[in-house]
Amino acid sequence: AIIDFDKRGRANFENLKNGRDINFATASFGHGVSVTPIKLLSAISAIANAGIMMKPYILTSDSPEAVKRVISEETAEKITKMMVSAIKKNVIADIPNYSVAGKTGTAYVPDFEKGGYTDDVLNTYIGFAPASTPKFIILIKLDKPAGAPLAGLTVVPAFRELAQFVLNYYNI
């Protein structure tokens, strides 16, 4: 069955509407903007699908549905190569004999009472495989990890284990 994710949460990019360079600069590393997990999956799936955003679904036999082109095929290819390169340099994420594309994310938790951010973090890792002909995309998210504030130490090993399982299970 397809779950309609279109109305589940909203990303917030209001900070970018004023066009200030500082807001664009800080948004490049995740400050002043927010995105839901499903929107993050949709964005990265557009990279995995040569620039075409797909309608998200979970474990269904229905055919994937293209929504629209959001970036050029060339841009998607360049970003994929960067994501593959990041994994090849990070032994924790690398899966031998496979080309996997992935990216870590570590974000500070907003302080809604005082403004700004708390010292707590959210760790994410998102990736797809095989990088050249993607069959799946995985997002691992961990809220406020204890003792290991960097995504590379928390969610990356979980991604690697799950991706290896999926690759083996489906004989990819």
Which ranges hold each PLM region?
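Short, gly/Ser/Thr-rich active-site loops of penicillin-recognizing serine hydrolases
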Residues: P64-V67, V156-I172
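Beta-lactam-recognizing serine transpeptidase/beta-lactamase-like catalytic domain environment
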Residues: A1-K144, A151, I172
